[in-house]
Amino acid sequence: MVQTTKKLSILATFLFCALVFVACGDSGSSSVPDEFTDPIITPEEPPLDTITEPDTTTSDSVETYPTSFDSAGLHTYILENGVSSGNLYIFYPADSFLTKFEIGDIVTVAIVGYDTLEMPVVEKTSDVPIAHFLFSAVAGSNFVSLSIHNDSFSDVIGITAQNAPIEVNISLKEKGGFLFGLEMRYVQYLDVYPERYPELSVEEYANFREIRTTGMGEKKLYRSSSPIDDCLGRNLYVDSLAKEAGVATFINLTDTEDYARTYKDFDSSYYATQNVIYLSLPVEFYSRTFKDGIVKGFRFMIEHEGPYLVHCIYGMDRTGFTLAILEALMGAKTEEIQADYAKTFSNYFNVVDGQQVTLNEQQVDFFKAVVTRNLRAVYRADGIDIADADDIDWATPTEQFLEKQGMTKEEISALKDRLK
């Protein structure tokens, strides 16, 4: 039995001795890692996730349409060959753009006839959290671009090449407004060894916890890192904690069933004896695949008894977003949703010189803002606008969101009954 009140420095020798340091990869058919950028186990530079080069073989030229760069910003057009690989490309030299704007600025991008969005100016997709919009400007490039980290900007906005030319106006929203966000890339070092986390309990190290936000019943819903994937060195802890909590139904957001069964010790795990649905979802919150997948998972919860546990690999992005939806559905307040989401990052990051350094308040606040920003953005993409305020009702728009994904009012009510 895992004793959950003691520090890991005491427990490591008898619970963790068989676990080995293994670099994590994704599993199942999902090809995108579960990440903010890829959480880094060794202190190396984050990978350079460059924007795909656009197809410039067509004859359209930006000179065909009026382009100006004045005190108000850049006024230009997206052409037919600027809609490519899910991104929107503006054929305006990045070096010229960077004479007025700088990396780390936040800009307002008005895509005339479609939407007006705020996003940071960065170089690569991994400079921003999962599902965030970004304006990429890489010195030396003959273009700048609009993208979403791990999703298709053009699909989310509803733009195809046939819609071109499309007028775009870019203006400054906040000078240096995302500089702290860029610094946050360098707190993402984690470790598989429990002795690196002397201040964490077993539950915290395993990223295992019960969800007790407003409206959620006692011992109804849990979240964690993977109970079966040994790449983070936490699976045996999670499996033991899940057994202790009496978890009866697992929602596996990451694996296929066939892949899950290849994990070491899977057959002898508590996990293997319980109800499990294997969803193998990409980290693409706007995508039809992801939305259909979580609905499938929610229906599985309706059909099976709890307690329930939702997990991916880290229990971070896919799990964090899915749990935010369930918390919002049950009536959680903004601060509760944010605090639960940010807790995961406090449990993993920030290992420096072999020991975790507790995240400061500003760093925690950064992660808190990520989850509600993602909820608003994904809901908005489905036509559900939510005020940018803290004291809002999340339950009603969440029910609307689930209905748009095909759930009936009766199913939503049944899901809520399971979680009360």
Give residue spans per PLM region.
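Bacterial N-terminal signal peptides that target proteins for export
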Residues: 2-12
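Long, compositionally biased stretches
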Residues: 58-150, 154-156, 161-169
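Cys-dependent protein tyrosine phosphatase-like superfamily
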Residues: 26, 30-33, 40-56, 150, ...
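C-terminal motif of bacterial Sec signal peptides marking the signal peptidase cleavage site
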Residues: 20-23
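Active-site cradle of extracellular carbohydrate-active enzymes
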Residues: 309, 313
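Ser/Thr-glycine-rich phosphate-binding loops at phosphate-binding pockets of nucleotides
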Residues: 314, 318-319
